[in-house]
């Protein structure tokens, strides 16, 4: 079974650069306090590291 990671959006995309908004959309987040469970891959980790002020890692599974 693959490792998964649960992330939560804690920052608003309002008044943020377009690249940061697109990164949120790429992670499947678009509303405040929404959570997603994603596969823990280098691509997902890289996207999270680009916007650490807007997302929070809730839990790492596996």
From Swiss-Prot:
InterPro entries found in the cross-reference section: Ribo_uL30_ferredoxin-like_sf, Ribosomal_uL30_bac-type, Ribosomal_uL30_ferredoxin-like
Family matches, as Gene3D superfamilies: Ribosomal protein L30, ferredoxin-like fold domain
Pfam families listed in its UniProt record: Ribosomal_L30 (PF00327)
Biological process according to GO: translation
Annotated GO MF terms: structural constituent of ribosome
Record's keyword terms, sorted: Ribonucleoprotein, Ribosomal protein
Signal peptide: none
GO cellular component terms given for this protein: cytosolic large ribosomal subunit
Family, as annotated: Belongs to the universal ribosomal protein uL30 family.
Record note on quaternary structure: Part of the 50S ribosomal subunit.
Name used for this protein in its record: Large ribosomal subunit protein uL30
Species per Swiss-Prot/TrEMBL record: Dinoroseobacter shibae (strain DSM 16493 / NCIMB 14021 / DFL 12)
